[in-house]
Amino acid sequence: MILFAWKRYALLKQQKHAGWKIFIALMFMAALTSCQKSAPDNAEQRSPEPLQKITVAYTYQPQSTLVHVAVAKGYFTEEGLDVQPLMHTYGKAALQSVVENKADFATVAETPVMFNVLKGEKIFVIANIEASSMNNAIVARKDVGIISPGDLKGKRVGYTPGTTSDFFLDSLLTANGLTRQEIKPVALKPEEMQDAIIARKVDAISTWNYPLTQINRQLGADGTLFYDREIYTETFNIAARQDFVQKNPETVKSFLRALIKAEHFVTKNPDEAQSIMSATTKIDKNLIHDVWDAFNYHVVLDQTLLITLEDETRWAMKNKLTERTDMPDYLSFIHLDSLKAIEPEAIRMNR
């Protein structure tokens, strides 16, 4: 009898213990189910923020390679930016889009920056993205007697006002003992130059790539090129309105980070970068390859920019291309802080 009671007691205890196990298991399953049900809600809460839309005015020129690559490789998207492209044939027009508040960023050489500062526009250069001492030149027709730069005297020379074409022309003339008054300058848009020289409306033109190499190729044996790496170094830059930069500091940093990624890609993969440029600009890859070595693609802020801006300002004042008579404080138009925050070694400029 005692044995039977003991067995019954043990059985009840075992059942009670099993009941607790079942209860705990059920509670665990309920908690797990609750977590699974709430997972989509948590995932929704953690979903990435929508991309910030920005408009970038940039050119088909080789100087804008880093922007083309950053778009094609998705680097802007990785940095939270949705780039709306606004394409231009040259940087002066791209910068005008920024000045008119049609774009947030522009790729542009330093000469249009200088003229806009002299006009009182509140812009910042936030980075240099390219530099070259071999991108600008004068291409001339030999069959009109132009063999050396001195032969430009009395000839019709095409140029694009307010651009590096304008400044380089005067620099080359001065270096060869000539003045603007001793030639017949003809103002042309970049896209008009090739037809003008082929149709003999001008005898020479001052321009940049790609048109420079395209025109020289078309002229063949009748063409000649005048470079001078000692008199001018072009910088191609990212410019933006000062108020935009001040109100959107994180956007500016994200933009620069994407360009730095593009710089690293271009350095390691030049052939693929050339393919990207060919695909995005519809320009023959052989032409892109032929001019590639003329350019240095680095995201920096270099002292060269400051020196060139001041040199070009003196030129503009001397030639009465501006009403200003005092040198602007160009450092106040160069925004160092954003690039310094993400890549301090890229700052090569003295305050």
Outline where the language-model segments fall.
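Sec-dependent N-terminal signal peptides
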Residues: 23-29
